[in-house]
């Protein structure tokens, strides 16, 4: 398992290739990359600032990853989340799960993203055409996480 919280951008393709190269038993790698949108809830977004609680955020992500590893036969799991100032089009989050078979990788990747959105202490502040605003969690994120209970 690899957990990273960082300011720097990342190359999702290189991350996936590294996961596969590290283990010849990998039959499937499923990944998700989230990007900063230029539009949200009817407002133009010119940028975003992501804050986190150092130490606590990494522990929360590790707890989610451990639960995924207990639920599915994974060979590798990576969670990478950016913080700081971001512009539309930039990657925010990368989650990838590697397994011998695709279904475990699909399920684990979805589980980690659903739990990350509801259980990891990140705060998003969007700069919009109407000023800056903190982004609230969505009911749909909680509903998605509830399916794993």
Report the location of each language-model feature.
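N-terminal, polar/charged subdomain of small-to-medium soluble alpha/beta proteins
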Residues: 1-92, 106-110, 114-149
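Short glycine-rich or small-residue beta-strand-to-loop segments that form or flank ligand, phosphate
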Residues: 92-99
């Amino acid at each position: 398992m690899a957990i990273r919280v960082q300011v720097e951008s990342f190359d999702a393709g290189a991350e996936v290739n590294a996961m596969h190269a590290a283990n010849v038993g990998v039959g499937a790698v499923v990944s998700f990359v989230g990007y900063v949108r230029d539009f949200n809830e009817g407002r133009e977004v010119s940028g975003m600032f992501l804050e986190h609680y150092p130490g606590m955020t990494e522990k929360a992500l590790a707890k989610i990853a451990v639960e995924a590893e207990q639920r599915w036969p994974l060979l590798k799991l990576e969670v990478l989340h950016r913080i700081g100032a971001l512009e539309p089009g930039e990657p925010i989050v990368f989650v990838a799960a590697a397994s011998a078979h695709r279904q475990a990788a699909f399920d684990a990747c979805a589980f980690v993203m659903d739990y990350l959105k509801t259980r990891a202490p990140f705060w998003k502040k969007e700069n919009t055409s109407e000023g800056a605003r903190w982004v609230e969690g969505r009911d749909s994120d909680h509903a998605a996480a509830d399916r794993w209970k």
